[in-house]
């Protein structure tokens, strides 16, 4: 069923972006699965056409809010709205092990500066932040003891409000354990950032970052 939902999302985008309007027979592409899996999946898709009611943003915030044990996030861009930042801080204050993994090597320098700027208050409040040092990492996933989401969704304003994004919300013992093992491997290959080291970042970064942050919704 999840595969069919992803197919529908693709066909809808194809239909919307076509230069010439065409009617697509969706059912033509529906294939019956050989067998059902043991993971419950729900496809979530969103975009500017749905503003201000953004389902992806709501699901992410709910995952953060309802986490009780751990919350692991991988994102190439960490540019948070105040309410999302506060949700993460409240999670760590109630005893949740909150960890965020970002790339050490960026694909965009300004994104690196903005991501690093967002570290400060999170580190100060007890959230653990890791940078993937072997290379650039572009994975986007969030995992708690309750569920996981893997998709195209960055933790930034553009993903939640300006871009068309999709992901798969999953709940199942095996898939969650597989993703958790993947996180465990990634944490071992990363460098953990401390609040003290963040405070001693390059002086030029400290000068540029507040200015960039004023225009963060444009990047």
Feature-to-residue mapping (PLM):
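Charged, low-complexity intrinsically disordered terminal segments
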Residues: 1-219
